[in-house]
Amino acid sequence: MASETTITPAKADAHSRNSARFRIAVVGIASVASALLMLQSDAGLAPVLEVATGYGPAITVIALFLLLVRFIWVGFRHICGQQMDGSAAWPRVFFSRIFWGDLLVSLAALTVTVSSFTVYKSTVIGSDGYRFDALFIAWDRALFAGKDPWVLTHAILSSPYATKVIDILYHPAFLPMVLGYIVCLVARGRPALRYTYMTSYLAGFVIIGMIAANALSSAGPIYDGVLFGDGTTFQPLIDRLASQNTSAGPFSAVFAQDYLLALNERGLIRRGGGISAMPSMHIVLAFLWAFAGWHLNRFLGVAVTIYAAIIWIGSVHLGWHYFVDGLVAVLMLAVIWYAAGRSFGLYGRAQVIRATT
């Protein structure tokens, strides 16, 4: 019987079919993102191109850098006689049509989708007001015995230095989560898992970050009195964060919240701009890693799930989100992940463990 990493005709055929499905899926998702923007926004094409000229080169450089690191690492292991399982085929995969086809299509789809999302979030979501904050406040209080969840997190994590740690985990340390898509592009094994991750990543931006966010438009607690409400509901949280920012800051959250509000008030479109609370894309990206982690090994699954839970708690603690923003995000992501996984063979049948040419 062929070993798990042996390149057999059946595995080569399965990988080729998955690659074709993946390319069709990501091109379709990017097309939907662009269509939504063109149909619902008056911004036109210029801001999309401007944002894309920032995202595109950065994404490409990071991908090529990680690709170079991977190629050098495999070559070094071969030179040292420490051949890794399945790595002998990697240089051949590096020069294959499937590999480069996936890479180029994926980078283009990512650039188009994220650029469309950015402009959509800045020009469509909230353009007719943030309508559902009051509803989500009520949902949160129904789940937490009449209290706002931030009251509980700040009662337990009362130190400003606890808030500082959460702020670090929520913002600067979140970069690897955002780069998960590019890591999957240059990785070697488990194509079914990688295709599921990347498809879910892009679909999450469109289905959750664009369609659902516009249908359920809300600004989040920190913007009480500015973008919704009369400023009384969350003023204690806003004052507390301002005080802690003075004593233990500066917090990235406070800077980012002020920055996004300034962009919103001036009608500017910038990378990372736009205000939207429900559902939380921050939590979507965190739980994408958690879902993937469980398919790699139990320890990683537990570790990344704990981190994702911290992100969820942190989103409430820092005033970005209502608790239910995360709940809806995780439930929607689970459906997207499972649908993509079924399509690529992650569930229901044995997946191809190693990529082939």
PLM features: what roles do these ranges have?
Residues 217-226, 277, 309-335:
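Interfacial helix-loop-helix junctions of multi-pass membrane proteins
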Residues 2-18, 77-100, 348-357:
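Membrane-interfacial, low-structure loops and terminal tails that flank and connect transmembrane helices
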Residues 215-295:
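Membrane-interfacial catalytic/cofactor-binding modules of polytopic membrane enzymes
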Residues 93-171:
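Intramembrane catalytic core of multi-pass membrane enzymes that act on lipidic substrates
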Residues 35-48:
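Juxtamembrane "helix-exit" motif on the non-cytosolic side of transmembrane helices
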Residues 162-177, 273-292, 323, 327:
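Membrane-interface loop-to-helix entry segments
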Residues 179-184, 283-301, 331-340:
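Membrane-interfacial alpha-helical segments at the cytosolic side of multi-pass membrane proteins
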Residues 105-107, 182-217, 222-234:
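Interfacial segments of alpha-helical transmembrane regions
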